[in-house]
C-alpha cells in the first residue's frame, strides 16, 4: 500500500476500530479450543467485536495455525485489515542457540547476526512476523533474574550485538524477504539497572550514567533499523517507563529519531496503578497514550477507556490516529496487505526447522561461546572420557541454555 492509501484506511476506521487496533491479545483468544482461555484471560471481559478487531496477536505457533488465525481474523474485520503475529524468540526459535549472555561471550558479531537470521527464518516459515528481541538491557548485578537474556555488562559490546541481531532478524527488505521478521528492541529503558537486582524494582541513577551506559544499546538497535521498541516495567527517575513522556517523546522519538511502533510489556499499562502514578485504569490509559505507547499488551485500559477520555477532551484523537498509523505502516512494511499469510509455509517449516545446517551452526556458535573460568587439569579431555549432564533441566528444551 502507498502511504496515502494507509491514511485513507485510517479515515475509514471507526473510533472503536482505531482503539482496538492498539490492543494485543494472546493467541488463546483465537484458538478453536475454548479451554485455552483460562485464568486472567477469562476475566478480561472482552466483547467479540474487540477480539475480532484487536490489532496484534501474541504467541501463535505453527504455519497452519498462523494461517487459520489470519484467515478468520480478516474475515471478521470489516476492513479486512490483517493481524500482526508476534512472539518471544530470544536465542533461537526451534533450533536453540546459546543464551544471549553466552552469545556475548563469543565477541563475534557475525555469529550473533547468523543466529538471528536462522531464528528469523524458522519463525517466519511458522507464520510469525515480529520477535520481541533483542533484549539490550545492560546488566551489572548478577542477582537480577533476567541476566541470561542480556549480552552482558559492557555498553560497547551490548551495542554491537544489538545491531547485529537487528540486522540478522530483519535483513535488508522485510517486504521482499519473507524469511525475515521485524525486531523489537527491549526494554526501554534501563530495565537491567533495577536496585538490588530485584525484577520490576526502581531504577535510580544519574542521567549521565543512564546515557553513557544504558541507552547506547537501545540506540544501536534503533540505528540498525529495529521496527519496534518495548517499554520496561521499572521506574526511571521516579516515573514508570510506560507512562514516561520524557523517555518516549523526548529521548526515543525526538533525540533518537525512532518512528516505529512502541509496545508495552505484558500488563505494563495497568501496572501504572500499583506504581502509584495512576489511580485507575482510565488514568493509566491516559498516561500511556500521552507517553506514546502505541500497543497495549494483554490488559484492556485502552479499549475500555480511550474513547471516554477522547469524549471528555482529556486526549486528542490525533494521539490515537498517530498510533494506529504506526501500526498500519509496520503491517505494510511487512507486506501483509498484499500477502497476509507472509512466510507461513508448512512444507518449508518441515524442511527448515531444526535442519542439519541450522543445528551445525548452533553447535559451532555454542563452541565459540564457551569460557573456561578455572582450569584444574580439566582440559584437554581424553577421548575415553565421558561427561554426564545431570539435573532436572537436562532434558528440557524449554529451559535449554
Feature locations, PLM:
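Glycoside hydrolase catalytic-domain context in secreted enzymes
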Residues: 1-401
Amino acid at each position: 500500500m502507498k502511504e496515502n492509501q494507509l491514511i485513507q484506511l485510517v479515515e475509514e476506521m471507526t473510533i472503536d476500530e482505531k482503539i482496538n487496533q492498539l490492543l494485543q491479545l494472546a493467541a488463546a483468544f483465537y484458538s478453536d479450543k475454548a479451554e485455552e482461555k483460562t485464568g486472567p484471560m477469562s476475566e478480561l471481559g472482552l466483547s467479540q467485536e474487540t477480539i475480532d478487531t484487536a490489532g496484534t496477536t501474541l504467541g501463535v505457533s505453527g504455519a497452519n495455525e498462523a494461517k487459520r488465525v489470519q484467515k478468520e481474523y480478516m474475515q471478521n474485520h470489516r476492513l479486512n485489515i490483517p493481524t500482526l503475529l508476534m512472539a518471544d524468540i530470544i536465542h533461537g526459535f526451534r533450533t536453540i542457540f546459546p543464551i544471549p549472555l553466552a552469545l556475548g561471550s563469543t565477541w563475534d558479531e557475525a555469529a550473533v547476526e547468523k543466529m538471528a537470521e536462522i531464528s528469523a527464518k524458522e519463525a517466519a516459515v511458522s507464520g510469525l512476523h515480529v520477535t520481541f528481541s533483542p533484549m539490550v538491557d545492560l546488566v551489572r548485578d548478577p542477582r537480577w533474574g533476567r541476566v541470561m537474556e542480556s549480552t552482558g555488562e559492557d555498553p560497547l559490546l551490548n551495542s554491537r550485538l544489538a545491531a547485529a541481531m537487528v540486522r540478522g532478524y530483519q535483513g535488508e527488505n522485510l517486504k521482499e524477504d519473507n524469511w525475515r521478521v521485524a525486531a523489537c528492541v527491549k526494554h526501554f529503558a534501563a530495565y537491567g539497572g533495577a536496585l538490588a537486582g530485584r525484577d520490576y524494582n526502581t531504577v535510580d541513577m544519574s542521567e549521565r550514567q543512564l546515557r553513557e551506559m544504558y541507552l547506547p544499546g537501545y540506540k544501536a538497535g534503533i540505528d540498525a533499523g529495529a521496527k519496534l521498541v518495548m517499554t520496561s516495567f521499572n521506574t526511571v527517575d521516579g516515573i514508570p517507563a510506560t507512562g514516561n513522556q520524557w523517555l518516549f517523546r523526548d529521548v526515543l522519538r525526538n533525540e533518537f529519531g525512532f518512528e516505529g511502533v512502541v509496545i508495552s510489556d505484558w500488563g505494563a499499562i495497568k501496572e501504572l496503578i500499583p506504581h502509584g502514578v495512576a489511580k485507575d485504569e482510565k488514568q493509566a490509559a491516559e498516561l500511556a497514550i500521552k507517553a506514546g505507547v502505541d500497543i497495549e499488551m494483554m490488559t484492556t485500559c485502552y479499549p475500555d477507556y480511550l474513547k471516554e477520555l477522547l469524549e471528555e477532551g482529556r486526549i486528542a484523537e490525533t494521539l490515537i490516529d498517530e498510533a494506529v498509523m504506526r501500526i498500519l505502516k509496520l503491517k505494510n512494511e511487512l507486506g501483509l496487505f498484499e500477502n497476509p499469510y507472509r512466510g507461513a509455509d508448512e512444507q518449508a517449516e518441515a524442511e527448515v526447522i531444526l535442519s542439519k545446517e541450522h543445528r551445525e551452526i548452533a553447535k559451532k556458535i555454542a563452541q565459540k561461546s564457551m569460557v573456561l573460568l578455572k582450569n584444574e587439569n580439566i582440559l584437554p579431555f581424553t577421548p575415553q572420557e565421558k561427561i554426564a549432564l545431570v539435573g532436572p533441566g537436562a532434558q528440557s528444551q524449554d529451559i535449554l541454555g
